[in-house]
Amino acid sequence: MSHYFYLTPQILLPFSPLTSQEFDLIRRKAGASWQDETRWSDSSVTTYTGSYRKKQLDKSMCSQFSFRAGQHEPECKQMSLTNSSACHLLCWAGTQETTDIKGLFPDITRPFKKSFDVKHGVAHQIWDFGDCFPTPPNYGKYCVRPKKPAQEALINYSRRGKGVLKHLHGRCDSESKVCSSEDSEADRYSDYGWGGPSSPFN
């Protein structure tokens, strides 16, 4: 029965299309071909398994990223913003973590108070929350409250638009005055030409 199900899993044949010896030969060749394919996939640089399966981090790199035994993980404190429904998540590590990894990551071992100042300035620049954060004592050193470029651009644009409108309005007024004076002179000449009140043909 295994012959039938292996060759035609959905249809039951009334006879065996292969002998048992031929069936075993096909199964052995298929197994050998599958093993060759697996070996090639494991050793080829063009496959994910061959490229990354046996690669590991160096011991020095692993020691940099692994926490020491008994070391506390960084604390995460959440601060809710008063003028927004979004919450600003501030995570920072304690002094123990800072002293333990000092020298390994020189760019991130600076005092975390400065990074809080930078985040404070970014919040001002993006959302303009005003003074919802407590202002640190060294706020002026690291944070300068930026101006509102979008609002200033709109104000300048509206002023320029008003100036252009005034200029166009003045030109239209001057042109209308010139046109009205020309019309009045043309009317006066037409009165003389077509027998107006002072025409000599009357």
From Swiss-Prot:
Residue ranges, annotated region (Disordered): 178-202
InterPro entries: DUF4722
Pfam families: DUF4722
Domain of life: Eukaryota
Protein name: Uncharacterized protein C4orf51
